[in-house]
Amino acid sequence: MERALAIGEEASRRGIEHPNLLGLAAQKHMRAGDSERAYPLLLRARELSPHNADILNDLGLCLVRLSRAREALSTLEAAIREKPDSARPHFNKALAHEQLGELDDERRELERVVAIEPRHHQALSLLAMLAADRNDYKATRDYAGRALALSPDEVPAKIALVSAEIGSRDFNAARLRLEALLRDTDLDADNRALAQTLMGDVLDGEGKFDEAFRCYAASAETQKTHYARAFGASGQESFRAQIERLQSYFSSAPAEIWNARKNDAQTPVHVFLLGFVRSGTTLLGQVLAGHPDIEVMHERDCLNEAVRDFIVPKDGLEHLGALPDEALMPYRRSYWQKAYAWGYSAERKVFVDKSPLATSLLPLIARLFPDARILFVYRDPRDVVLSCFRRRFAMTEQKYQMLTLDGIAACYGSLMGFADFWREKFRLDVFDARHETLLANFESETARICDFLSVALDPAMKDFASRARVANIDIPNSADLARGLSRKSEGHWRNYRNELMPIMPALAPWCARFGYPEN
């Protein structure tokens, strides 16, 4: 195979255009991790041979690796039409759905892969992980067992079994499996960080909180080292610096133009579900999603063009404030077109955009959607910071800054301060939703939220846990959500009081602001 790849690359270098040779040259680049160089070769190969299933499949995979999963889907569907009994395009289509957070669609494609090729150990491993996320531990063990029988070194299958063992409180079995994984010097950085986090969860479950904290810290350090080149000195404006710049601008900006509410009868009622990560936005989003008149969009970036033009440039806010309303229409259309592309219809009475960190984009929301309502979720700041430290997120520049307790506390303070500033200066239609109140008084608090959204309380909203057990949800705590309402994590920060002590002064004003007692 290596010889064939080399021949393909040499032919490409000489300008010889044959689809199979171009495909081989592209594969060589992709194996080297250079999908950018592979992409034009595969495009040309498709032009020369538009019905070649192998070329279409490789192009689809290349698009996934370039983070262009939505484009990849149509290409992979074309590959499947040409060769419906091939497992490869179905597997790559599953990877595209995973990248898009469409985990139920990912599961369906993986099941098709296994139906076509029962010994596909990678598909079995991913099915095991999805089952663990749903708390379906019987399916987890079945899929993982089959994967490991075919490929004893299949790391995702081992990780899935660990998740099932932790969920079943079989901490000793989970520890033994994790110790073996962590001894593997070839374990890649992402899986090592995940294994360290899971070891922390094992120790946390056993009440060994000081040891658990050291594991979480080790996981953060692994991620920090691994992503240092990409995010450590990216040259981008940091999340906190951006918020400080926005707040500085609005300290002297006239309020009138940013308060231009139309009070039009909106169809649908447009709502932004904001807060800070790990504050309870996911739980509330899933509760709202059970209502027949509410559609919830989960963390999809539909404002990226407006961010590019008005938030990133230093003079962007001044430009945004000066634009007449009609000049903003293309950005509104772009927002809704992106929502439709993600599969949302916006045809129900209420459309909820759940985007916790979009709290920093309140200026855009105010100008583009002046009649939007804001559901602002908050939770004990100490539990929020601890939860962020214990969980792993898809890495971004913002998340890279949140790999230490100091970094999380600083980002929290900046974002909450910005939200408070906007409340005081600008007229926002805001409902404050306290996470602990939703847990303690579910029905009455849900009724209050429904009243704010102009819909009646619906009994189906209680069934979020059963929906989570059937569906896969693209969030770090999907397994917790599948267990239903639980107050066991409330006040969990007390178990890590000593470790959190250095950041307590930074969090104290916010504990007081939201009414959480010192002890």
Regions found by a protein language model. Give the residues of each.
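Short gly/Ser/Thr-rich phosphate-binding loop of adenylate-forming enzymes
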Residues: 362-365, 437, 443
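Glycine-rich phosphate-binding loop used to anchor ATP phosphates in small-molecule kinases
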Residues: 334-364
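Alpha-helical solenoid repeat scaffolds of the TPR/TPR-like class and their adjacent stem/linker regions
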Residues: 1-342
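Short beta-strand segments
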Residues: 273-275, 286, 298, 350-355, ...
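Conserved phosphate-donor/acceptor-positioning beta-strand/loop module used by diverse small-molecule
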Residues: 365-388
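PAPS-dependent sulfotransferases, especially Golgi type II membrane carbohydrate sulfotransferases
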Residues: 143, 172-182, 186, 193-267, ...
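Conserved coil-to-alpha-helix start sites within the AMP-binding
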Residues: 359-362, 383-384, 416
